[in-house]
């Protein structure tokens, strides 16, 4: 055969602690790996990939802004001064609707390059509004909800964050390494779900990020 492929799917148990009570719990992360070898006249060409799917929580920025505008009108009507209103919104983010987010990240590289699975999992978790846990005490629950509402993100925001974090964590990878990013947010107030994805080489992502930085400076 001129081409050989091996593919693996598995479930990876991650030990975690809740943010306030430090209760130990576990999370199941879906992981997969693939290797493809092609025969050549010299050494075989091997490409490999590793990826994971992680579940988290997102909070909608749009609905939150609507609720903030409403709350601001009420506070102004009660003659609350602007400084106090700003301080209130800093400490107490407004209500919004939430989604259960499913992030997917896969990186394909040459055989001689290493991609740390734990970094992939961390990138996925950190790219959503907040992480979720199997077991939460009351203090933990309040912390998670507050963290999510202080960090609202659209589905496309999650994909952008993953791309930026990949470049930060895996800056040593060759430019032809291929990054596949997907995010699905299961909507709570819509009949549909929100979805975004991006597939690009490391070199393409670097060019895109440099373009964003140039535009921000102008």
Region annotations inferred by a language model:
Residues 1-218:
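N-terminal intrinsically disordered, cationic/polar leader segments
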């Amino acid at each position: 055969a001129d081409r050989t492929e091996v593919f693996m799917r598995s479930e990876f148990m991650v030990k975690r602690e809740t943010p306030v009570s430090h209760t130990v719990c576990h999370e199941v992360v879906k992981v997969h790996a693939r290797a493809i070898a092609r025969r050549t006249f010299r050494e075989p060409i091997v490409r490999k990939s590793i990826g994971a799917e992680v579940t988290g929580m997102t909070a909608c920025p749009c609905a939150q802004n609507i609720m903030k505008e409403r709350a601001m009108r009420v506070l102004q009507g009660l003659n609350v001064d602007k400084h106090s209103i700003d301080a209130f919104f800093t400490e107490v983010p407004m209500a919004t609707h939430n989604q259960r987010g499913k992030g997917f990240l896969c990186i394909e590289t040459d055989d001689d390059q290493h991609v740390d699975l734990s970094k992939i999992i961390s990138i996925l978790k950190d790219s959503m509004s907040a992480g979720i846990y199997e077991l939460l005490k009351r203090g933990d629950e309040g912390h998670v909800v507050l963290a999510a509402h202080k960090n609202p993100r659209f589905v496309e925001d999650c994909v952008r964050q993953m791309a930026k974090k990949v470049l930060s964590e895996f800056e040593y990878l060759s430019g032809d390494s291929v990054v596949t990013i997907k995010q699905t947010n299961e909507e709570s107030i819509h009949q549909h779900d929100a979805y975004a994805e991006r597939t690009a080489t490391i070199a393409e992502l670097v060019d895109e990020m440099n373009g964003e930085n140039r535009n921000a400076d102008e």
